[in-house]
């Protein structure tokens, strides 16, 4: 546990609550002190949904500390069972309440005796895992619980559906553009004649989990959640899975070819012929997606060789790095992720597409790297957007964590062929057009930016004279920030505290020497 101003992945209980509140008719009870119960507010504010968040906080207060939690927790579980009539109640502590070292499994066993619904304790180590790891683990735990129970009762139909079908595993609440990605994947599967057996956890029902083995195979769009469940289903029920993320022209085509491979396992036996999706890939790439055409246009060629910095969760950071490098010819000077648990896979995927790799969940390290590399554009999370604003570098948001702007009402997927159009727009609009900025500064107007670009670490020990500020304002905006930082670096090295025009020229000469 650590105290942080900013965390890319939240504490473990948030991941558990995200999974539990994604299912239909599942209620979560959070055993937590006041202050840890912000999930309801966060979800209500960010998700564009009409339903109340099905999470109740069982508050740890002074009375609980004096008498113990059992009575209160059992009472809350029983009450919610009667009021809401859920199929499942998930009990989770938080990292704070875990300090009490209470036997919560015993509370669950006690309450199960008097409850009509199933009750389980989230099996997560709150000190060892983060939000995404906990979400993956909780989803696997729920799937295992119901499938193992169905196997015991001999209530599992292992026969596959008559027509090609798929389970989509990993869409859940508060995900980055996931509602839109889900719609896009549904459309893609419909075009390919593949039926959707189940989507879990988003909108899924725990009573239907026993039917998961009826699908021909599983799809896991994001590495962060779903892989543990897919691995379990493969091991126990022999269900193959596709884990390629269909983001960008190249990977979407690869994804569809993998679907074709698995559909053809049973195609002859079930539908009498083997499928071929090559004509669909060609049609979509050339006529539906504008990205392939755009990447050959003069607009995109203007971006060739531009420097970009990419950072986010492993799925989006890898996909974005590949798209920028191989589909748009943009130089990715650094690709990074905060998913340290997935660092090996991340390095394997991006090593040939970028110059540097950054594996860290410390936002100050990310900010310092951006300030040092001075890219033309940043593609990252909400935090990188803040960093970009302070440095005067444009930023496109491509990964969670994000704020309300990235829960749009309009249709903006990142997956599939429509997603390629969205990404192409985001990339092109993220790069500052240097001449545009320069003209605005020449002619003035409400868009005129501040003369001096702010640096990430504000140097209070350096002052610019009026003359040097005036001289700096004559420099075009797209290189001004770099010149300012180089001048300040030179001044610090020489022990100068007041930057004059002469110091500016001396700094320039020292660089060109």
Swiss-Prot record:
Binds 1 [4Fe-4S] cluster per heterodimer. The cluster is bound at the heterodimer interface by residues from both subunits. It is found in: Plastid, Chloroplast. Substrate binds at residues 434-435. Keywords: 4Fe-4S, ATP-binding, Chlorophyll biosynthesis, Chloroplast, Iron, Iron-sulfur, Metal-binding, Nucleotide-binding, Oxidoreductase, Photosynthesis, Plastid. Coiled coil: none annotated. GO terms for cellular component: chloroplast. Gene3D superfamilies: 1.20.89.20, Nitrogenase molybdenum iron protein domain (3.40.50.1980), Proto-chlorophyllide reductase 57 kD subunit B (1.10.8.550). The keyword Nucleotide-binding applies. [4Fe-4S] cluster binds at residue 36. CDD domains: Pchlide_reductase_B. Pathway: Porphyrin-containing compound metabolism; chlorophyll biosynthesis (light-independent). One of its GO terms (molecular function) is oxidoreductase activity, acting on iron-sulfur proteins as donors. Its EC number is 1.3.7.7. It comes from the Eukaryota. Its cofactor is [4Fe-4S] cluster. It holds the Pfam family Oxidored_nitro. One of its GO terms (biological process) is light-independent chlorophyll biosynthetic process. The active site is at 299 (proton donor). It is an enzyme of class 1 (oxidoreductase). Its main location: plastid. It catalyses: chlorophyllide a + oxidized 2[4Fe-4S]-[ferredoxin] + 2 ADP + 2 phosphate = protochlorophyllide a + reduced 2[4Fe-4S]-[ferredoxin] + 2 ATP + 2 H2O. Protochlorophyllide reductase is composed of three subunits; ChlL, ChlN and ChlB. Forms a heterotetramer of two ChlB and two ChlN subunits. PANTHER family: LIGHT-INDEPENDENT PROTOCHLOROPHYLLIDE REDUCTASE SUBUNIT B (PTHR33712:SF7). NCBIfam families: DPOR_BchB. Belongs to the ChlB/BchB/BchZ family. This is Light-independent protochlorophyllide reductase subunit B. It comes from Chaetosphaeridium globosum (Charophycean green alga).
């Amino acid at each position: 546990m650590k105290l942080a101003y900013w965390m890319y992945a939240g504490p473990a209980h948030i991941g558990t609550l995200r999974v539990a509140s994604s299912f239909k008719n599942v209620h979560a009870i959070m055993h937590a002190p006041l202050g840890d119960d912000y999930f309801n507010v966060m979800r209500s504010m960010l998700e564009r949904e009409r339903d109340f968040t099905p999470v109740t906080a069982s508050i740890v207060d002074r009375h609980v500390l004096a008498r113990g939690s059992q009575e209160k927790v059992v009472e809350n579980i029983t009450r919610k069972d009667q009021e809401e009539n859920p199929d499942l109640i998930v009990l989770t502590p938080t990292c704070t309440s875990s300090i009490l070292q209470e036997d919560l499994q015993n509370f669950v066993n006690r309450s199960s005796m008097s409850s009509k619904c199933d009750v389980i304790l989230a099996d997560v180590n709150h000190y060892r895992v983060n939000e995404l790891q906990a979400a993956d683990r909780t989803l696997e735990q729920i799937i295992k619980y119901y499938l193992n129970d169905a196997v015991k009762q001999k209530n599992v139909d292992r026969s596959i559906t008559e027509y090609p079908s798929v389970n989509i595993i990993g869409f859940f609440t508060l995900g980055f553009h996931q509602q839109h990605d889900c719609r896009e994947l549904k459309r893609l599967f419909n075009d390919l004649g593949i039926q959707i057996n189940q989507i879990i956890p988003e909108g899924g029902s725990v009573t239907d989990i026993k039917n998961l083995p009826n699908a021909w195979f599983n799809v896991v769009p994001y590495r962060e959640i779903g892989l543990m469940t897919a691995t379990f289903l493969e091991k126990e029920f022999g269900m193959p899975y596709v884990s390629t993320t269909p983001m960008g022209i190249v990977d979407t085509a690869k994804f569809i070819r993998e679907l074709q491979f698995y559909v053809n396992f049973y195609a002859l036996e079930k539908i009498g012929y083997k499928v071929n999706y090559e004509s669909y890939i060609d049609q979509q790439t050339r006529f539906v997606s504008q990205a392939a055409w755009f990447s050959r246009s003069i607009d995109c060629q203007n971006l060739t060789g531009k420097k970009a910095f990419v950072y986010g969760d492993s799925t989006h950071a890898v996909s974005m790095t590949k798209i920028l490098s191989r589909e748009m010819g943009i130089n990715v000077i650094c690709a990074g992720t905060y998913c340290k648990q997935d660092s090996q896979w991340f390095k394997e995927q991006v090593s040939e597409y970028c110059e540097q790799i950054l594996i860290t969940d410390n936002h100050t390290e990310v900010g310092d790297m951006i300030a040092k590399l001075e890219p033309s554009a940043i593609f990252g999370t909400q935090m990188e957007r803040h960093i970009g604003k302070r440095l005067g570098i444009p930023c496109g948001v491509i990964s969670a964590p994000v704020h309300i702007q990235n829960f749009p009402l309009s249709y903006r997927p990142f997956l599939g062929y429509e997603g390629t159009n969205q990404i192409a727009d985001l990339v092109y609009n993220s790069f500052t057009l240097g001449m545009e900025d320069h003209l605005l500064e020449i002619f003035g107007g409400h868009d005129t930016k501040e003369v001096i670009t702010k640096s990430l670490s504000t140097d209070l020990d350096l002052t610019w004279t009026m003359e040097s500020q005036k001289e700096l304002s004559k420099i075009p905006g797209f290189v001004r920030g770099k010149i300012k930082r180089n001048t300040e670096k030179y001044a610090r090295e020489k022990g100068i505290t007041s930057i004059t025009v002469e110091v500016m020229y001396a700094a320039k000469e020292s660089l060109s020497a």
